[in-house]
Amino acid sequence: MNKRNKVKHLNRNKGHRDALINNMITSLFKYERIESTQAKLKVVRSHAEKLITRAKKNLVTDLKPEVQLHNKREVMKRIKDREVVVKLFEDIAKRFETKNGGYTRVLKLVNRISDNSEVGILELTSRKERSTLLKERIEKREIQTKAREEKRATRKSNSAPVSKETTSKKK
């Protein structure tokens, strides 16, 4: 007898499905907007909302450090990129501090021409404008390049000069 399956399989095995969901969640929090098929977006939406709720729990000031660490580790099971985790806990969670649910929205687009799939966009409801996101990325890159240059300069100054010794041939 067939029983009802609560998991949307997305025509993939468990490992592939989990990797797909994790990567899409990471992209959603990194770029605050992703485009994919409706079926994938519906699955990713539920997981993303749960992670935002988990990140919001860390905003409570009288929360035990063990619970805060537990929340971060639970989120890091899904999101492997540390920068995205920091963005989720420090930026995205603060934007949704007063909201109870409804952190994302799915917008329907025209069906894809090649296979007539239902396509849509999943985005955060209080999304930053594209121009501010670009400015933040440029500033971040500049900081990283300065740090790299300083690191290279310290390496060069710390390394001792190599003297060339001439070798004479034995006759």
UniProtKB/Swiss-Prot annotation:
One of its GO terms (biological process) is translation. GO terms for cellular component: cytosolic large ribosomal subunit. Residues 156-165 have a biased composition (Polar residues). Part of the 50S ribosomal subunit. Contacts protein L32. This is Large ribosomal subunit protein bL17. The gene is rplQ. InterPro entries: Ribosomal_bL17, Ribosomal_bL17_CS, Ribosomal_bL17_sf. Residues 140-152 have a biased composition (Basic and acidic residues). One of its GO terms (molecular function) is structural constituent of ribosome. It comes from Leptospira interrogans serogroup Icterohaemorrhagiae serovar copenhageni (strain Fiocruz L1-130). The keyword Ribosomal protein applies. It comes from the Bacteria.
